[in-house]
């Protein structure tokens, strides 16, 4: 399995989500960003297993992110998706916050990212899904 191959344990609610939907683009995709310069962001895509587009595949993303950040504060983050600006939506797999959903502000891409770029969005993947809403169209 993906977990045994990568020697990680995923939260049960996220594992069940993967088995039921295998990622994808949610209709209700907007979430609040507390403490960020933007009020909200969106889920452009949740990655899946064996996705035909390599850049939307969990294993490809897991391999890409291995060692991506110099700061060890990022070591326990597992990227599950991205927003419209390619910011990272992750699960925290650490003992302290296991299963929490994390937003990493990747703007600008070329800077060294630190703890200041991390925003805890929800305590669990289920709580994150429950807070998603459909954004109103801006005219």
Task: State what each model feature region is.
Residues 97-110:
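Intrinsically disordered, low-complexity regulatory segments enriched in Ser/Thr/Pro
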């Amino acid at each position: 399995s993906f977990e045994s191959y990568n020697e990680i344990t995923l939260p049960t609610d996220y594992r069940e989500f993967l088995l039921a939907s295998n990622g994808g683009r949610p209709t209700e995709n907007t979430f609040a960003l507390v403490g960020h310069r933007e009020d909200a962001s969106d889920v452009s895509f949740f990655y899946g297993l064996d996705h035909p587009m390599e850049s939307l595949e969990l294993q490809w993303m897991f391999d890409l992110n291995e060692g991506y950040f110099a700061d060890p504060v990022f070591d326990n983050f597992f990227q599950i998706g991205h927003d419209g600006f390619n910011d990272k939506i992750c699960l925290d797999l650490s003992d302290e916050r296991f299963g929490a959903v994390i937003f990493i502000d990747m703007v600008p891409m070329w800077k060294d990212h630190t703890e200041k770029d991390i925003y805890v969005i929800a305590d669990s993947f289920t709580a994150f899904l429950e807070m998603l809403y459909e954004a109103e169209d801006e005219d």
